[in-house]
Amino acid sequence: MLTHLDSQGRANMVDVTEKAVTSREATAEAVVRMRPETLQLIQDGGHPKGDVFAVARIAGIQAAKRTHELIPLCHPLLLTSVKLELQAEAPDAVRIRARCRLAGQTGVEMEALTAASVAALTIYDMCKAVDRGMVIEQVQLLEKLGGKSGHYRKEEEGQA
């Protein structure tokens, strides 16, 4: 059953009023593939627009905080932590991991996915002048903790 649909099939925001406040956490990732020269430019700090990783990290944090403004039926959440790790993977990729946490009545999967996605889009935006062939891939939820549905880890599903 899709929780965002009412009995007539109309989209509605899920009512979480009666749900218990619990600790919740989600980790998502995205990968940006690029030419090796582009990755080297980022790593050397020689990009004309500045520190690509720093800007992407801030963009991801901001995106997580504003997810409810982008995805229509998401609840506005009081996130207690948003962390992004960006790692160069030679010869041609950047892996972005976003982790969101809160004590609340609904999960933070969409916030983590949004953070990773927007960080990847920011890398694309900053580097498109030197590499229009970049590809954003593998946007996925890696792990989710807390709430009624419990613990999910991607590897447990056999999708690693």
Curated annotation (Swiss-Prot):
In what pathway does it function? Answer: Cofactor biosynthesis; molybdopterin biosynthesis
Pfam families assigned to the protein according to its UniProt record, in alphabetical order: MoaC
Active site per the UniProt annotation? 125
Binding annotation for substrate:
73-75, 110-111
One of the GO biological process terms: Mo-molybdopterin cofactor biosynthetic process
The alphabetized UniProt keywords are: Lyase, Molybdenum cofactor biosynthesis
Q: Which SUPFAM superfamilies match?
A: Molybdenum cofactor biosynthesis protein C, MoaC
EC number(s) stated in the UniProt entry for this protein:
4.6.1.17
Q: Which InterPro entries does the UniProt entry name for this protein?
A: MoaC, MoaC_bact/euk, MoaC_sf, MoCo_biosynth_MoaA/MoaC, Mopterin_CF_biosynth-C_dom
Provide the assembly information.
Answer: Homohexamer; trimer of dimers.
Q: What does this protein do?
A: Catalyzes the conversion of (8S)-3',8-cyclo-7,8-dihydroguanosine 5'-triphosphate to cyclic pyranopterin monophosphate (cPMP).
The record's similarity note reads: Belongs to the MoaC family.
| Protein name (database record) | Cyclic pyranopterin monophosphate synthase
Species? Pseudomonas aeruginosa (strain ATCC 15692 / DSM 22644 / CIP 104116 / JCM 14847 / LMG 12228 / 1C / PRS 101 / PAO1)
